[in-house]
Amino acid sequence: MTQITRDFRGQWMQQEPMSRHTTWKIGGPADLFAIPADEADLAGLIRRCREKGIPWMVVGNGSNLLVADKGIRGVVIHLGRAFSDRRLDDRRLTAGGGCALSGLARFAVRAGLQGLEFACGIPASLGGAVAMNAGAHGGAMENIVRWVDVIDDEGRIRRYRGEEMDFAYRHSRLQREKAIVVRVGMELRWGDREALERWMEEKLALRRKSQPLEFPNAGSVFLNPPGSLSAGQLIEEAGMKGFAIGGAQVSERHANFIVNRGGATAADVLALIDAVRARVLATCGIELQSEVRVIGDSGGQVDGGGTEDSHQRG
């Protein structure tokens, strides 16, 4: 990896355990884990990877992500403090792709701005939230994003307008394009700060009560299918609540969460996901779709997605 790190000005670690960088606390080592110093450093790293034929991917907060037990062959990029700036201009909020989404929501509410408060409990980076069109409580990123700056797989900076992002339910164009979100422009609206703060506290209290925050997890595992029953309700109806394989367990608090009760492996989680899907299909006649992004499943090779991780409602 010396040909990759020679001109790199940021931080880098070899054979870095990905269990340190995912909310499931699961995952084997990455060949190289890199935190760029700035946009130019990031662009240069991507160009060198391309020139040398070395695969790369980006990881934000590590939620909604399962890394294979064998780890990742290639470069894993994480956007740190250099990509966590934020700026307000009237109702327009500009922020770096590495910003914590929940912190950004609180920042906006403290300024009396409405539109991002839905994200107060979403454990994702801003870049990941945009890539997956994260949403909760009736809100979604597509409603507030006006433009997105990305660095593509050739190391070029490109800007997409909101209407060019192909937003749909938990989807954007960045799920089919290899690019890293470095900056996002959002437009909010004025609101009642005290009312917004009360609303956020109510939602966070509900989250603490209904979600298994005491154990490592990656957020909701399955997308809610069309119809009146949620994925969690279907899993519970199928009798899978509390079911475990190895160290991985369907949460006894919320059936659409799989928790790491200690020592869980990626193989445990994948086997449990398959078991849940099979039982729900046999019992309810509905095939659940997983929203977990699995990385390194082909012999530990980085996949071609290039987008960041995200999280959505249960």
Swiss-Prot record:
It is an enzyme of class 1 (oxidoreductase). Belongs to the MurB family. Its main location: cytoplasm. It catalyses: UDP-N-acetyl-alpha-D-muramate + NADP(+) = UDP-N-acetyl-3-O-(1-carboxyvinyl)-alpha-D-glucosamine + NADPH + H(+). PANTHER family: UDP-N-ACETYLENOLPYRUVOYLGLUCOSAMINE REDUCTASE. InterPro entries: FAD-bd_PCMH, FAD-bd_PCMH-like_sf, FAD-bd_PCMH_sub1, FAD-bd_PCMH_sub2, MurB, MurB_C, MurB_C_sf, Oxid_FAD_bind_N. One of its GO terms (biological process) is cell division. The keyword Flavoprotein applies. NCBIfam families: murB, PRK13905.1. It comes from Heliobacterium modesticaldum (strain ATCC 51547 / Ice1). The gene is murB. Its EC number is 1.3.1.98. The keyword ATP-binding does not apply. It is found in: Cytoplasm. The active site is at R170, S220 (proton donor), E291. One of its GO terms (molecular function) is UDP-N-acetylmuramate dehydrogenase activity. Pathway: Cell wall biogenesis; peptidoglycan biosynthesis. Cell wall formation. It holds the Pfam family FAD_binding_4. Its cofactor is FAD. This is UDP-N-acetylenolpyruvoylglucosamine reductase. PROSITE patterns: FAD_PCMH. Residues 25-191 form the FAD-binding PCMH-type domain. One of its GO terms (cellular component) is cytosol. Keywords: Cell cycle, Cell division, Cell shape, Cell wall biogenesis/degradation, Cytoplasm, FAD, Flavoprotein, NADP, Oxidoreductase, Peptidoglycan synthesis.
